[in-house]
UniProtKB/Swiss-Prot annotation:
Species: Thermus thermophilus (strain ATCC BAA-163 / DSM 7039 / HB27)
Chain residues that bind Mg(2+): D78, D120, K121, E442
Binding annotation for [2Fe-2S] cluster: C46, C119, C191
The reaction(s) this protein catalyses: (2R)-2,3-dihydroxy-3-methylbutanoate = 3-methyl-2-oxobutanoate + H2O; (2R,3R)-2,3-dihydroxy-3-methylpentanoate = (S)-3-methyl-2-oxopentanoate + H2O
Protein name: Dihydroxy-acid dehydratase
The organism's taxonomic lineage, starting at the top: Bacteria, Thermotogati, Deinococcota, Deinococci, Thermales
Amino acid sequence: MRSDQIKKGLKQAPARAMLRAVGVGDEDFGRPFVGVVNTFTDGMPCNFHLRELAQHLKAGLREAGLFPFEFGAPAISDGISMGTPGMRASLVSREVIADSVELIAQGYLYDGMVGLSACDKTIPGTAMGVIRSGVPGMVLYGGTIAPGEWQGRKLTIVEVFEAVGQRAAGKISEEELLEIERRAIPGPGACGGQYTANTMAMALEALGLSPVGYNAIPAVHPEKERATKEAGKILAWAIAHDWKPKDFLTRKSFLNAVAAVAATGGSTNAVLHLLALAKEAGVELSLDDFDQISRKTPVIADLRPWGTYTAWELYEAGGTALVFKRLLEAGLLFGEEKTLTGRTLAEEVERAYREQEGQKVVFPVEKALKPHGGLVVLKGNLAPQGAVLKLAGTERTSFEGPARVFDSEEAAMEKVLKGEIRPGDVVVIRYVGPKGAPGMPEMLSVTSAIVGEGLGPEVALLTDGRFSGGTRGLMIGHIAPEAFVGGPIALLEEGDRIRIDVEGRRLEVLLPEEELERRRARWRPRPPAFTHGLFARYAALVRQADEGAVLEDPL
């Protein structure tokens, strides 16, 4: 065992003495040692329950003959930091979490690793770290929140964001906004639609890095405790067979994950995160793969933010296994791909499959809700390296209008709340990319305000930042290259005509190349937002969105 370097032999007596102090007994030195990265925090609901869930996980690992050691990693709440300078920390935390997992795995020479995650960046962060650690491992998702309820309708956090715009437009009262705020989040768990956390949790099951069916179990559902304990047996098998993530993560595995995202109208953040995970696994994956898979994969799940149902209701209907079953029946998944259990994806789906009688959440492919998947990649003179649109959140496939140009989200939000954005406008928020912000913050506050004011179908938004999984409407993000490095979005001026052609996959400013060249000659780079510390290092090393906003390797 790898951990024998820590715990066996004459010279390791001091190490054993220290391990005895934390509860390792004589018989335990013969067990595989496992690191459990727990992203618990009592600062937000998504990860609030992970302290308790970790106890069930560790109990299951011990029952399976392993010895677990728990450690922490940071967790940033997108919902709390949204629309503030704190949002810069969100995507940065993905890299810090991955580094933390790698650091602990290497520092303690553990034989296996488990990532216990919940909020948006903790899922890809722990997954990147588990893959990078080079030992058998898996990622477990803490589960979705239960929906809130007000006046007979189910609520998620997105309804609160949109209520801000409704209040600004005078559509609801201050008292109604307060009631929505009070009732939307009834307890622990991640945001309750097919937003980023639930999208990535499903993607990890499709990849084979999480047990099929586990991640769909809601945070406070009684089944969660039993399934968490059972997961210990899976890791014990993987360690016994030296079955590591890089042994089963293939290009087809990643295409399966992309198809799952497309079929459920999932978050555009999945593009960034799956590109980053593919890099860790040494697998070729590009923006074009997302577009090609989405073209042939219909939307078959009626999930929020664009649809009707919450993630809790998806679990009741049959969960992720039901989605995968439908896609397998239509030949839209590679069922022969192996998973962390050593069995194929198709075998795992059959073991986990169930369907609630009369459910209306997941449809057969021949009765799909939309003929094409939810992700569209646009290119053109505004986005030479690509931009991403979630088509499942909008019915419009073309748009042309004048640019309303803002160099920060705050400036755009001010105009939206003052009612100064008009139907037909194209709101442009730039200098908020991976390097520019830095950290590529999400624009949910401003996009929700636009929708809340009733302008969703009539206003487009472009940004070199990104969007929450809760965003809906004609919102195009991940524009690459970003403004900070001199991408064409930096050259836009107020009133420039912008054309969006979804069918043709084009995003263009209607200016001659000569004019763009004149503006490019006048453009000057901006000073960095940070010159010292973590954010300065991140901005110096991060790559563009079309590469997953991963950090540069030195070689």
